[in-house]
Regions:
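Short beta-strand/loop motif that positions the catalytic acidic residue
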Residues: 418, 423-426, 430
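Primarily recognizes the serine-hydrolase "nucleophile elbow" in alpha/beta-hydrolase
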Residues: 314, 319, 367, 374-418
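Gly/Ser-rich "nucleophile elbow"/oxyanion-hole loop immediately N-terminal to the catalytic nucleophile
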Residues: 295-301, 349-383, 393-396
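C-terminal catalytic histidine-bearing segment of alpha/beta-hydrolase fold enzymes
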Residues: 431, 435-483
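A domain-start/cap signature at the N-terminus of enzymes
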Residues: 158-303, 453
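Short, surface-exposed loop/turn segments at beta-strand-coil junctions that are enriched for proline
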Residues: 93, 133-140, 294-298
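Short, compositionally biased P/S/T/A/G/V-rich stretches that sit at domain boundaries
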Residues: 46-80, 87-91, 182
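Short substrate-entry loop that stabilizes the transition state in hydrolases
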Residues: 297-349, 431
Length: 483
């Protein structure tokens, strides 16, 4: 069951009860968005979420929605100081009736506290600055700067959430060495030898850019960059994902540089989960994607391929890290190569450059890996489900079957390739994509007489949980279909 921890109690999300409130808030948000009033838009969204999920909107919740925690960077060495600022997102229009305090804790990779500040009383909602010091003996890993807001004399916090940082031993030395080695002439000569080596090189360039950015800015992954009150909601769900595992993936970049510099192809025999990057055919930007290659990978064999499209707010990590691991698990067990695209951001909508990202990744993976082009499939969730329908039917000659989850298209999409095998999945209690729309889409497919059509509607299932529930069935469906 999905929910959130707020004021020390678990509040379940009841999508069926949310529907009227959700629709009303959506109408207000839409009107404010058209008016261009970002502050009122944010306040309305937060108030609506609080009323829907908590049944209340009081001063403490409003203060929690106004304050946010800011960190100066994402990546640090042992012994470094991490500046922390708690500041208001906008001004509170009337004097506060209550008194409030914030507390900052620093948690190690096992989420045990290393440091805990005193309660820092707020003067109105003026910014509070503090810092945490990373121990010199700290191991590499993911650490948390935890923030909590308290009403004076309360026994429990109003809200508690965190921002993550990564500690990497000898970070500055390693980045400097990689920057130097990546510019060596012998490495650059390798790039033009094959598409595989070129992909390894653009992957290195993207990783170096991310590590340099992480020195000077806090990098958020899917659903992580929201203000703390929203962040806490997403923490209790299943979609929050780091942009990358900085402490371990630095080794991947180092290995790629060493292999290329020694004349070896880093991707020729490598299996497992990899974060790769290529240059977009649209604007030459470096764009990441995730790729999973099954164990015992053998270039003399051909492999089926699934390309997955994330939903709104997600990124290339969503399918690989969320949904109870069912996406990679099926790929591993069945011997599939699977790719999860970035879509040019969390809200690209799989149109224009966002749609081209899907085709670029498909083309690239088919060039670099021995893919069975008669067994290439497309699937997606929510916004990615709509993208699956739109792109899949537009490029019907590229795919053997499609599987949109909690996303749909139009009868016009279906008419482009009515022979396309189509698996449609929907949760009955979906508050974001009403079940009626999925049923209507299924009926449109039936009206076309599509010869290979399967519809799954799970009772009592919401917008997110449906993905893991149907993943095995989708791969079963893919197993049955060739182009």
């Amino acid at each position: 069951m999905l929910g959130l921890i707020f004021r020390n109690r678990f509040v379940p999300f009841s999508e069926q009860e949310m529907q009227p409130e959700f629709l009303a808030v959506r109408e207000r948000v839409s009107a404010l968005g058209d008016a261009g009033d970002d502050v009122e838009l944010y306040k309305t969204m937060i108030e609506g979420m609080a009323r829907m999920y908590l049944g209340a909107w009081d001063e403490g919740i409003e203060v929690a929605s106004i304050l946010d925690i800011n960190l100066a960077g994402k990546l640090y060495e042992p012994g470094a100081t991490v500046p922390v600022e708690i500041a208001s997102l906008y001004e509170h229009e009337v004097p506060l009736e209550g008194r409030y305090a914030v507390q900052v804790r620093f948690l190690d990779p096992s989420e045990e506290p290393i440091y805990e500040s005193d309660l820092l009383m707020l003067e109105g909602l003026a910014a509070v600055s503090t810092e945490v010091v990373i121990p010199r003996e700290a191991d590499s890993g993911r650490y948390l700067v935890e923030y909590s807001l308290w009403e004076e004399d309360a026994s429990d916090p109003i809200v508690r959430t965190s921002r993550s940082i990564y500690v990497i031993e000898a970070f500055e030395e390693r980045i400097t060495a990689m920057l130097f080695d990546s510019r060596r002439p012998q490495l650059r000569r390798q790039v033009g030898r094959s598409s595989s080596r070129a992909l390894a090189n653009t992957t290195v360039l993207w990783h170096l850019d991310m590590y340099q950015r992480g020195r000077r800015e806090w990098l958020a992954g899917a659903y992580m960059g929201y203000p703390v009150i929203m962040n806490q909601i997403f923490e209790q769900g299943t979609l929050m994902v780091e942009p990358m595992q900085f402490d371990s993936e630095i080794e991947l970049a180092e290995e790629f540089i060493n292999d290329l510099g020694s004349g070896r192809d880093p991707l020729s025999t490598r299996s497992g989960d990899m974060r790769l990057a290529y240059r977009s055919s649209v604007d030459r930007e470096l764009v990441p994607f995730r790729l999973f290659v099954p164990d015992n990978y053998d270039r003399s064999q051909s492999y089926p391929l699934v390309v997955a499209l994330h939903g709104a707010g997600g990124d290339e990590n969503t399918f690989m890290e969320s949904f109870d691991g069912t996406f990679k698990e099926n790929a591993r067990d069945r011997g599939y190569i699977v790719a999860s695209v970035n879509g040019r951001g969390p809200y690209g909508g799989y149109r224009d450059a966002s749609a081209q990202d899907v085709i670029d990744v498909l083309d690239l993976v088919q060039r670099v890996y021995p893919i069975d082009e008669t067994r290439t499939y497309l699937m997606g969730h929510s916004m990615g489900g709509g993208g699956t329908v739109r792109i899949g039917f537009e490029h019907a000659d590229r795919f053997a079957a499609l599987a949109p989850i909690a996303g749909y298209g139009s009868a016009e999409d279906l008419a482009k390739a009515p022979e396309m095998p189509l698996f449609i999945a929907q949760g009955e209690l979906d508050a974001l994509v009403p079940v009626e729309r999925a049923r209507n889409f299924h009926e449109a497919a039936q009206a076309l007489g599509m010869p290979s059509l399967h519809y799954v509607e799970n009772e009592g299932t919401d917008h997110v949980a449906i993905v893991a529930e149907v993943m095995d069935q989708i791969f079963d469906w893919f197993d049955l279909h060739r182009r």
